Amino acid sequence: MPKYSQVFLKDAGMCRDIATALGPEEFGLGVEIGPGRGALTEFLYPLWGAKLAAVEIDPLMTARIKESFPGLRIINSDFLTLDLEAVFPSGTAAFIGNLPYECSTAILIKILAFSRLGAAVLMFQREVARKITAATGDPDYGYLSVAVQAQSEIALLADVPAASFSPVPEVDSSVLVFKPRKTLADAVLRERFLGFVKNAFSHRRKTLLNSLSMGLNMDKTEVEPLIKAAGFDPRLRPQNLSVEDYLKLSAVFERGAAGEKAL
């Protein structure tokens, strides 16, 4: 396994499908995350031209990409440490990439928080993709499902078998397409919502009342009236509430907390 745990996509047909999933004319710039050996870049660069930038953590791969694609803006950095607003200060951005398995969800959450996100086409381990797209009540439905679906519309582009990569990983992958929703445009509101949902799922085997009480460090006598005010049964499990339910419930808790501060 390479130093940075990369698995490189070698299926040219899949690279073409990913590269053409979005129309460059709809965006101010495209950002490829982790181009590696450049298999996907070969299809992206002719389409995006000067509008394409790439972020690569591996200095050796960075040098290789620079040599293979003269004129391409490539940033040798860990994507998770980049200040996206500063590095890409203008233009609606599309993010494309075969993400490292171990930090794919952190990268996704960072992308969804970008103020000028236009869309994203990203590769995940299939198990993670199932968690992202899981429906209410599904075994895979949890914090990640709500956090991502509250901020974006998601579509499955393709399932990708392990044999499409080098070295061959032990798991299959899936490519998802994300289009941002405007529900959590405010950064402070988004962080509060994500924190609220994380607390709700902190004890997913317990009732919503118990899980929120423990997660928020609030007495049940404070939590129960707020759950009921939102129109929900406190005995429900966290996985029984939909994304829209969580948006509604978190808003009620926000108003409840604001009311307490005003007293």
Predicted regions and their residues:
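Long, well-ordered amphipathic alpha-helical subdomains in the mid-to-C-terminal portions
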Residues: V171, F178, V188-A230
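Catalytic cores of RNA-modifying enzymes
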Residues: M1-G195, T221, Q239, V243, ...
